[in-house]
């Protein structure tokens, strides 16, 4: 069993592997501010606010409408405590508009779910890591890979990595 929830002492979960590539790109491009969008309970938004705070980068999160559950309340509080600027986007269309309007020189856009080709390299890399562990005899070849999904970016990247490996 892979335990990506233990991948970082700051914030665990599948975003850590994605952000390894995304944040490297941010610094390579000399960006000084992060803009992202997501639901009120977005774990990607939480990861962004926490990693942004740790790196000294201002973060703006444009939230789209979502039921306010206990988890959503905790996510909002976590983002606020990390210093993120929280913007109410409302419906999806207005969220897209407000996110676009938030971008200016120096801004780095992280898509909802951190789901894009660059971020997906994190989970293609995870499949290579898994294959290496199997080849070294550290674990048996898995019969199945099970994971929760939101934007399905992780699922797509794992499937791509698995197809490359055969």
Residue ranges of predicted features:
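PLP-dependent amino-acid enzyme catalytic core
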Residues: 1-166
């Amino acid at each position: 069993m892979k335990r990506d929830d233990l991948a970082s002492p700051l914030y665990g979960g599948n975003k850590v592997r994605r952000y390894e590539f995304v944040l490297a790109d941010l610094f390579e491009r000399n960006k000084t501010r992060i803009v992202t969008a997501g639901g009120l309970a977005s774990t990607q938004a939480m990861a962004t606010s926490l990693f942004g705070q740790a790196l000294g980068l201002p973060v703006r999160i444009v939230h789209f409408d979502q039921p306010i559950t206990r988890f959503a309340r905790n996510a909002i509080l976590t983002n606020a405590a990390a210093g993120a600027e929280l913007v109410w986007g409302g419906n999806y269309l207005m969220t897209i508009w407000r996110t676009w309007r938030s971008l200016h020189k120096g801004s780095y856009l992280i898509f909802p779910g951190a789901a894009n080709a660059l971020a997906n390299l994190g989970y293609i890399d995870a499949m290579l890591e898994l294959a290496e562990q199997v080849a070294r005899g550290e674990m048996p070849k898995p019969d199945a890979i099970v994971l929760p999904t939101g934007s399905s970016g992780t699922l797509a990247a794992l499937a791509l990595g698995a197809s490359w490996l055969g």
